[in-house]
């Protein structure tokens, strides 16, 4: 199993798949699904891109140190992973909590970012969303794991999709993946999202950032109440940020419309690569890890 040890000694499990010389997409998974969030879009992306998928600190086969977790801390871990595997600049694709990490990463590490997509994410939760995450945190502490998984599924996946042939097994799928998690990490992930405030980072973002949001998402909608900072407002504040909405779904575009998600994000990355290659010093060597 491939592991990378980052600066503070934590070992991260990672997989690097796809065409050897393809542009690399660093994938940042969500707080409950982790790297499994991308399971239905990986094959589509691998037709053109190389994928760097990993278990974040506290998840899966990576180390699970006890202590505080934060969105900015997970972004720093991602930069450490790039150092460890010998990658200079990458495309970044994060979803849900991973989208929040993508925002933090793009702001903090512009020299490592060609372009980024923050899927179903925002920069700061409003009162409603903070209450949702606090509720999740309490559920993790008190509810049966399967009951918590079912509750989250009803918030993340649309009612019509649940009753469609594609969504027939969605509840069991979510149960199986959520069961892989360490409850300690999930609790701290909820706390990290509850307390997150990337407002000051948004104006500093200098690399192209695509926000993809479902119009009917109750967890991370494009528009938040005044105390929050959602995708639409982010795009108004910074000209390098753009928003694409999925008009018929909620939080789970990578599950409910994976082909559309792959196409929209892939085309955005292609345009960003074209622009970056036209503006040296970026070359294809920047995203090619050394032979091992």
Residue positions per predicted region:
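Active-site loop/oxyanion-hole signature of alpha/beta-hydrolase fold enzymes
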Residues: 43, 52-93, 263
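Conserved loop-alpha-helix segment in the C-terminal half of the alpha/beta-hydrolase fold
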Residues: 43, 206-249
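Gly/Ala-rich beta-loop-alpha elbow adjacent to hydrolase catalytic centers
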Residues: 94, 98, 102
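Flexible "cap/lid" loop of the alpha/beta hydrolase fold
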Residues: 103-108, 112-144
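Catalytic active-site module of serine/aspartate enzymes centered on a nucleophile-bearing elbow/loop
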Residues: 238-292
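Conserved catalytic-core motifs of eukaryotic protein kinase domains, centered on the activation segment
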Residues: 37-39, 62-68, 128-130, 222-223
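Conserved HGGG/HGGXW glycine-rich cap/lid loop of the alpha/beta-hydrolase fold
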Residues: 6-64
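Conserved alpha/beta-hydrolase catalytic His-Asp/Glu region
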Residues: 127-131, 146-203
């Amino acid at each position: 199993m491939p592991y990378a040890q980052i600066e503070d000694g934590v070992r991260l499990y990672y997989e690097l798949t796809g065409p050897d010389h393809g542009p690399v997409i660093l994938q940042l998974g969500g707080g409950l699904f982790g790297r499994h969030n991308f399971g239905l879009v990986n094959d589509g992306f691998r037709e053109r891109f190389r994928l760097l998928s990993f278990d974040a600190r506290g998840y899966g086969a990576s180390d699970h140190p006890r202590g505080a977790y934060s969105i900015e801390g997970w972004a720093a871990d991602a930069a450490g992973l790039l150092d460890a595997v010998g990658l200079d600049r990458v495309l970044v694709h994060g979803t849900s909590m991973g989208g929040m990490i993508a925002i933090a990463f793009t702001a903090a590490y512009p020299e490592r970012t060609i372009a980024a997509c923050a899927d179903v994410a925002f920069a700061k939760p409003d009162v409603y969303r903070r209450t949702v995450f606090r509720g999740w945190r309490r559920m993790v502490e008190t509810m049966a794991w399967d009951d918590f998984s079912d509750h989250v599924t009803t918030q993340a996946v649309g009612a019509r999709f649940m009753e469609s042939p594609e969504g027939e097994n969605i509840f069991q799928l979510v149960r199986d993946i959520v069961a892989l998690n360490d409850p300690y990490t999930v609790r701290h992930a909820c706390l990290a999202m509850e307390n997150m405030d990337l407002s000051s980072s948004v104006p500093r973002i200098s690399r192209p950032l695509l926000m993809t949001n479902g119009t009917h998402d109750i967890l991370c909608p494009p528009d938040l109440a005044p105390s929050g900072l959602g995708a639409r407002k982010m795009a108004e504040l910074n000209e390098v940020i753009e928003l694409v909405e999925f008009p018929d779904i909620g939080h789970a575009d990578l599950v409910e419309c994976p082909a559309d998600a792959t196409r929209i994000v892939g085309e955005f990355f292609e345009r960003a690569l074209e622009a970056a290659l036209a503006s040296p010093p970026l070359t294809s060597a920047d995203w090619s890890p050394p032979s091992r």
